[in-house]
């Protein structure tokens, strides 16, 4: 079920006038014909997979950091108890 996809691009910078011919020749007028819906779906899936993987890695890193902080608190408490008992 391939559908037509309309994409609008907004450029948020002013190109250097001397580079406009090069930009035009590298992009050309047929930029809208370079991708079909199948390619857009495939590329989107890859992007979504990368985003999901990065999210999972961030959650795991946060959990590891929390576990290390808890270990540090326990170690500090144990050292404090040992110090109190050594008096």
Swiss-Prot record:
InterPro entries listed in its UniProt record: Prohibitin (IPR000163)
Modified sites of kind N6-acetyllysine: 62
Record keyword Membrane present: yes
GO cellular component, one term: mitochondrial inner membrane
Keywords on record: Acetylation, Cell membrane, Cytoplasm, DNA synthesis, Membrane, Mitochondrion, Mitochondrion inner membrane, Nucleus, Phosphoprotein
Swiss-Prot/TrEMBL GO biological process terms: B cell activation; DNA biosynthetic process; mitochondrion organization; positive regulation of immunoglobulin production; positive regulation of interleukin-17 production; positive regulation of non-canonical NF-kappaB signal transduction; positive regulation of phosphatidylinositol 3-kinase/protein kinase B signal transduction; positive regulation of smooth muscle cell proliferation
Main location: mitochondrion
In-chain residues carrying the UniProt-annotated modification Phosphothreonine: 8
Superkingdom of origin: Eukaryota
PTM-bearing positions, type Phosphotyrosine: 83
Subcellular location: Mitochondrion inner membrane; Nucleus; Cytoplasm; Cell membrane
Cited function: Protein with pleiotropic attributes mediated in a cell-compartment- and tissue-specific manner, which include the plasma membrane-associated cell signaling functions, mitochondrial chaperone, and transcriptional co-regulator of transcription factors in the nucleus. Plays a role in adipose tissue and glucose homeostasis in a sex-specific manner. Contributes to pulmonary vascular remodeling by accelerating proliferation of pulmonary arterial smooth muscle cells.
Record note on quaternary structure: The mitochondrial prohibitin complex consists of two subunits (PHB1 and PHB2), assembled into a membrane-associated ring-shaped supercomplex of approximately 1 mDa. Interacts with STOML2. Interacts with MAP1LC3B (membrane-bound form LC3-II); the interaction requires PHB2 and takes place upon Parkin-mediated mitochondrial damage. Interacts with STAT3 (unphosphorylated or phosphorylated at 'Ser-727'). Interacts with CLPB. Interacts with CD86 (via cytoplasmic domain); the interactions increases after priming with CD40.
Protein family per UniProt: Belongs to the prohibitin family.
Listed name of the protein: Prohibitin 1
Gene: PHB1
